[in-house]
Each structure stands twice: as structure tokens, then as C-alpha cells.
């Protein structure tokens, strides 16, 4: 099966999208434009939604993107913007599914939502860690056929806010929105020496519902909790923004 890839950048939203038919790129672009409009307008009326590091109650008539982000924030005890990237990826894939797309991967700064009818390997990018680019997660088609989230937070890579120093905290969940906020929340506990920091992250992860599993990487050390996909050894030294490969 042939796949098509395109980078879509609209303001701060930068999506790397892989689909089985190029007609879906236009649908994805329209989804981003519409959801950005909804989010920006809500923030204009409710600026605390943009700046809060704590969960925020939202209005009953708030748009879907706002409600998803708020729910994810409460689930992980962080501000709603901690879920923004994963929520965009999730809404894109959900909209593509509604338009009969069979295979789609949306990656937004390390926050991935995918729906595939084949086994798919997602590579790990963890900055300067020795594990970066040498490890992947093999997701079975049964797990991802209806949509799935794999989101990564880092205190050493990228511009997103993290209060910890983990090279990567990767969270697996049916919801990319939930996974994104959880990754941020868990990553905030990555303080101290590597072993202690990883243990703190895993302890925090135990108390966050709606996630399947977590993998934490700091330097030469790593830890996991819950159910995560099978590890796959890779030889691809990929950079952020090109972290997945389909088989």
C-alpha cells in the first residue's frame, strides 16, 4: 500500500500527516483552520484557558476542542494547553475517519494520533539519550484500528513547557488528548538524579486514569509502567518531526 506524506503548518500548528489518499490533506487543513478558529475565539473570551497551569472549568457551550483539552487537563491535573498538540492530532484523525480514511497518522511535535489497518512502528525520539532513534514501539493493528494516541513530553527537546528534565516521557492511550496532558504532567516530576526522577515519574503515572502505559527515558536510564507496545530495535536516527515508519 502506498502512503502520502505532507507537512501542514498553520500559525503555531505544525502537522506531519501520513495518509493513504492525498485527497485527505485538504480535509486535514480545513480541520486545523476550523479548530484553531474555535480555540482562538474561546481564548479571547476566556484568557485564563491559555495561561493556566492548573485545570480550568469551561462553559457548557464551549467548542469540542476546548472541552477535550479541559477534560485532559483535569484528568492529569495540569492546565488545558498541555493537551493542545495531541488534541489537534486527535481531531484531525477523527475527522478523516468520518470521511472514510482507512489509514492516517497525525504527528504534532511528538504528539501522535493514528488510525491504521496494519501493524505500525512508532520510533522513539529522546534528544541526546542513547536510546533515541534506536528503539521503536510496534503497535498491533487491533489496537489502532479505531484511533490511538502516543504522546511524548520532553524537558530537553522542543519548546513546550516542562518542569522536569526527562529526555522523553511517552504515554499510550486511546485518546491523544488524554495522552498529551498526561505526558506533560508526568514529565514535570522528572527531577533529581536519573533513577530517582524516573521513579517519581512512574509513581505519578500510577495515579493518572485513562492511560494504558508510560515509558520514561533519561540519559542511559529508562523505566516503564502499565501496558506498552512491544519494543522494536531500529537503526533509524530520526529527528523530531519524522518519528514514525509504517510496515
Curated annotation (Swiss-Prot):
Extract the coiled-coil ranges from the record: none
Report the InterPro entries cross-referenced here: ApbE-like_sf, MA1715-like, UPF0280
| Residue stretches spanning the membrane | none
User: What is the superkingdom listed in this entry's lineage?
Assistant: Archaea
Indicate the family of this protein: Belongs to the UPF0280 family.
Q: Which HAMAP family match?
A: UPF0280
Task: Write down the NCBIfam families for this protein, in alphabetical order.
Answer: PRK04334.1-1
Its protein name is UPF0280 protein MmarC7_0482
Q: Which species?
A: Methanococcus maripaludis (strain C7 / ATCC BAA-1331)
Q: What is the lineage of its organism?
A: Archaea, Methanobacteriati, Methanobacteriota, Methanomada group, Methanococci
